Amino acid sequence: MFEIHPVKKVSVVIPVYNEQESLPELIRRTTTACESLGKEYEILLIDDGSSDNSAHMLVEASQAENSHIVSILINRNYGQHSAIMAGFSHVTGDLIITLDADLQNPPEEIPRLVAKADEGYDVVGTVRQNRQDSWFRKTASKMINRLIQRTTGKAMGDYGCMLRAYRRHIVDAMLHCHERSTFIPILANIFARRAIEIPVHHAEREFGESKYSFMRLINLMYDLVTCLTTTPLRMLSLLGSIIAIGGFSIAVLLVILRLTFGPQWAAEGVFMLFAVLFTFIGAQFIGMGLLGEYIGRIYTDVRARPRYFVQQVIRPSSKENE
């Protein structure tokens, strides 16, 4: 049996990107939720290259009296998961909770995650109840969840919800992974011995708009497919074999029909030829695009550039910058 260590200090990691309207409420509610734990805590807010006043507000929050806010300023926008990894590299707690800054996942759920982690779980995921998102967002999320479940074999219900708790050894394991395309909930489940999901409330977004546009969701889908499995490459080989066999069969059939009915049959086969040709060309472009995605990610990994560049860290204990 593995010894279950009680949680002594909680670190809350929150990526921030142009969230100046929600920041005061976010900090207030998150601080209140952490105070109710009766444990040591810290709140790490990572500014992911915001163009509004978010970074300045984070610095002020860290420098306030009796603050528990650690502000991490990144030089530009690297994306949600890279920003969270930047936060992971500066945590000091033995339980790390991730949370979005838009307040759609209430910070008041934090004590429930801590209590569940205290039961001995390595990862505590969440499932959003009565999601307050658009039909498009909910449909895209369902498709992504099904893709992940089939690829990884992990029957988690809501990979898109970032309100999650991770034991310190899980976070340390993730920090030792150096691939550029990182999807944290999946990566954490690879290392977790015991994982569980609990239902949580989901609220409407009060401030601003979602940072996940249509194209960002498409990029996320490509990231998930190419960083999880090489199955699409195997499927391309299978598809190529099927197309080759089909093309040969059609060619034989066309020869037989031409010999049987003469050259006038089906406009001398011109239309059929074009149909087959366009089918093959379309399949080739799909395959080339998918191969390009894999090769592009290999190229990115080979360059070994950092996932992010932390420009400044402001801790509450001192106003000096790291």
Swiss-Prot record:
Superkingdom of source: Bacteria
Name of the protein described by the UniProt record: Undecaprenyl-phosphate 4-deoxy-4-formamido-L-arabinose transferase
Alphabetical keyword list: Antibiotic resistance, Cell inner membrane, Cell membrane, Glycosyltransferase, Lipid A biosynthesis, Lipid biosynthesis, Lipid metabolism, Lipopolysaccharide biosynthesis, Membrane, Transferase, Transmembrane, Transmembrane helix
Membrane topology reported for the UniProt record: Multi-pass membrane protein
Protein function: Catalyzes the transfer of 4-deoxy-4-formamido-L-arabinose from UDP to undecaprenyl phosphate. The modified arabinose is attached to lipid A and is required for resistance to polymyxin and cationic antimicrobial peptides.
InterPro entries, sorted: ArnC_tfrase (IPR022857), Glyco_trans_2-like (IPR001173), Glycosyltransferase_2 (IPR050256), Nucleotide-diphossugar_trans (IPR029044)
Pfam families: Glycos_transf_2
Entry similarity comment: Belongs to the glycosyltransferase 2 family.
Record field: catalytic activity: UDP-4-deoxy-4-formamido-beta-L-arabinose + di-trans,octa-cis-undecaprenyl phosphate = 4-deoxy-4-formamido-alpha-L-arabinopyranosyl di-trans,octa-cis-undecaprenyl phosphate + UDP
One Gene Ontology term of the molecular function aspect: phosphotransferase activity, for other substituted phosphate groups
Compartments (UniProt record): Cell inner membrane
Class of this enzyme: transferase
Sequence ranges on the Periplasmic membrane side: 257-269
Chief location bin: membrane
GO biological process, one term: 4-amino-4-deoxy-alpha-L-arabinopyranosyl undecaprenyl phosphate biosynthetic process
UniProt cross-references to PANTHER family, sorted A to Z: UNDECAPRENYL-PHOSPHATE 4-DEOXY-4-FORMAMIDO-L-ARABINOSE TRANSFERASE, UNDECAPRENYL-PHOSPHATE 4-DEOXY-4-FORMAMIDO-L-ARABINOSE TRANSFERASE-RELATED
Enzyme Commission number(s): 2.4.2.53
Gene: arnC
Transmembrane segments: 236-256, 270-290
GO cellular component terms, A-Z: plasma membrane
Chain ranges on the Cytoplasmic side, renumbered to this chain: 1-235, 291-322
